[in-house]
């Protein structure tokens, strides 16, 4: 039996990174082999691609270029880090995966979800998460959180106007409906302690 692949999705400021940092020690304490990682990134090549994608000055980046860079980073991360961990029966907690591309590039950028999905099917060879937690939050609330977080670097996507971030959320909600068999929507506009408790319960009920 292979490991379990859990992805955490959500718009900017939804609390994904903070949530994963809390989930990691919880499952480690339960003697679970667990690994946390992120997209784009997780390994050297993909972190370099992340730097390119997030550079504020690269406002000229075209939507298809953006989609292909995310897919390239995803492929390398998958084969170099995620798949080996799953083969070793780890619980892998990943900050973003394919659903981000569907919401951001497929819907918000207007490339079409089906086209972006096919690009990523090629990149992932149909390796899909066992479970996805989607942290839902109003764009205004998420962006306000980012502004208050002095330790978080503002990236190119953060700088998009509010209409873009609203489209991202609309895209995510369509993705949730399309893949309702593996995606669970959780309200992210609640205290982090309650959010952690809810997500832990979902993971344990569905997978462990």
Swiss-Prot record:
ATP binds at residues 10-17. It comes from Bacillus cereus (strain B4264). Phosphorylation of dTMP to form dTDP in both de novo and salvage pathways of dTTP synthesis. Belongs to the thymidylate kinase family. One of its GO terms (molecular function) is dTMP kinase activity. NCBIfam families: DTMP_kinase. Gene3D superfamilies: P-loop containing nucleotide triphosphate hydrolases. This is Thymidylate kinase. InterPro entries: P-loop_NTPase (IPR027417), Thymidylate_kin-like_dom (IPR039430), Thymidylate_kin_CS (IPR018095), Thymidylate_kinase (IPR018094). Keywords: ATP-binding, Kinase, Nucleotide biosynthesis, Nucleotide-binding, Transferase. GO terms for biological process: dTDP biosynthetic process; dTTP biosynthetic process; dUDP biosynthetic process. GO terms for cellular component: cytosol. Its EC number is 2.7.4.9. HAMAP family: Thymidylate_kinase. It catalyses: dTMP + ATP = dTDP + ADP. It comes from the Bacteria.
